[in-house]
Amino acid sequence: MTKVSVLVAVYNTADYLPQCLDSLLAQTMTDIEVLCVDDGSTDASPAILQQYVERDQRVKPTFLKENTGLAHARNVALRQATGEYVCFVDSDDWLATDALEKVYDTFEDGVDTVLFRVVLHFTDGREKEYKMKPFETLTGEEAFKESLTWKIHGVYAVGR
């Protein structure tokens, strides 16, 4: 069984998609699958995905004919996932090279969900860290309530 399935919903992000995919394929943890669901993009995103499929068999695309929305695209990818754990990444995100290895190790310690530190990178070169709550263990109900007020959100991974 694959250790981590990375689910990437793609919609008109040709300008960012290569950096996203490069960051996923450069992970120190190599036992991953990258499930990309193109949600009816009208830009070069489908062609970019096809280029990556030819370079690396871990990239597994699905092409939807029309835009059905983020939730549907993620659900399509989730149904295809074979990993022990799943990580949701937007197609304009990129991860540090050891991110998935750290996530996997954290799951092996018995947690249910991992939230990532988020740093926003702007096209003019500025960076801004998204301020989230300091690390703590929350129950599912507490985490849900915190997410409603945007105190926690971002890139995340969950156990299956």
Segments from the language model and where they lie:
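Nucleotide-sugar donor-binding/catalytic module of glycosyltransferases
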Residues: M1-R160
